[in-house]
Amino acid sequence: MFTQANLFLLLLLAIALVAKNQSLLFAVGFLIVIKAVGLDQKLFPVIQSKGINWGVTVITIAVLVPIATGDIGFKQLGEAMKSYYAWIALGAGIAVALIAKNGLTLLENDPHITTALVIGTILAVALFGGVAVGPLIGAGIAYLAMQIVKIFTS
């Protein structure tokens, strides 16, 4: 059946193949298989509502693996904190987490913005080798920009 959704997924699959982007290829392939076996009505709402949180959890686990393996410990932390690069990274991590917090709310509540952010993320992943954490950070940056615009237009 050639619905708009199926055609869009096939287009994204083609983009993923041309761009040789495994993440996008896997994601689109996964969604196509779910639709093909008829589980989309049950699984898509769950994935849509909880998927971002699952993704953040998986990324967090991956980042914590060096601590769990002992590759990073208190000694390495102490040595790193002597570097101004570490302090810059610490500040950037805090800023990104705070910006993304508002982005999550925006993604959940505004489908219009979500569409633009998702398309932007897909383009960045497929064409420029970006990483698909973009919607969350992008939404946070969009939220921040919207608040700044409100200040100057109110």
UniProtKB/Swiss-Prot annotation:
Keyword Transport: no
Record bears the keyword Glycosyltransferase: no
Domain of life: Bacteria
Location(s), subcellular: Cell membrane
Keywords: Cell membrane, Membrane, Transmembrane, Transmembrane helix
InterPro entries from the UniProt entry: UPF0756_TM
Name this protein carries in UniProt: UPF0756 membrane protein RBAM_026200
Organism: Bacillus velezensis (strain DSM 23117 / BGSC 10A6 / LMG 26770 / FZB42) (Bacillus amyloliquefaciens subsp. plantarum)
Upper classification of the organism: Bacteria, Bacillati, Bacillota, Bacilli, Bacillales
